[in-house]
Amino acid sequence: MRQNYFLEYVPNAYINLCVDKAKQMANNRFVYDFKAGDKEAVQICAEWLVRYLTKQYSSILEDFVVVFAPCSTQWKYNKRFGYLAAILNVAGIATANEHVHIFGERKPTHNGGSHVVNEDIYHVSVDGEYFKGKQVILFDDLLTSGKTIEDFRSKLEAAGAYVEREIFLARTIHHDPISNRGVLQEMAEGFYEAVAHSKRCFPQGVNINKKSNNNYNKVA
């Protein structure tokens, strides 16, 4: 499965590995703002996504539908991806928000130090008739282990969809994206293997310069 992303996200515990902490912290803040539904952040992400998809698929983009991976609740899903879907639709890119249904709330429970989703209070369903035969491009905000997107992809494929690609706003890494400092430790700790094949959408990367609380100056 092809996986692509726009930004690197470095957890706070590893931020001191970064030679350009200010830049990485700005990238992290952008991810937080997007997840919170900040319209400026969503607008920028939409512009990146439209540009990337148009470049990759050109005239056949109309044959695909962009599907957003489920959040912890339906209202968060609507807030996070509703505006993004509207922008993509204006650009002529189909989305499927109304065909993904989230029931309950995803709450992590501890199991031997790991986090497991309690299926008794959370369930995701998709409209099988709609997705049967559809060519799908999946989008999610953050790629860490890949487990969440893998589970959702399996659900769509079971409904008869063909998932062509997965795209993420950011990929979680536990090393410095500039110097690669810490990458050997990341590999040793098992963080790296599951998503090592993922690639940047734009090889040169993207830079986020935040000018004020709700105003971004974007460079791609």
Task: Please provide the spans of the model-predicted regions.
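Short, well-ordered alpha-helices that flank and scaffold nucleotide-derived cofactor binding pockets
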Residues: R51, A86, V90, S154, ...
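Active-site-facing substrate-recognition patch
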Residues: M1-F64, H101-Q135
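Long, low-complexity, intrinsically disordered segments
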Residues: F202-A220
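Charged helix-capping and loop-helix junction motifs
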Residues: K79-A86
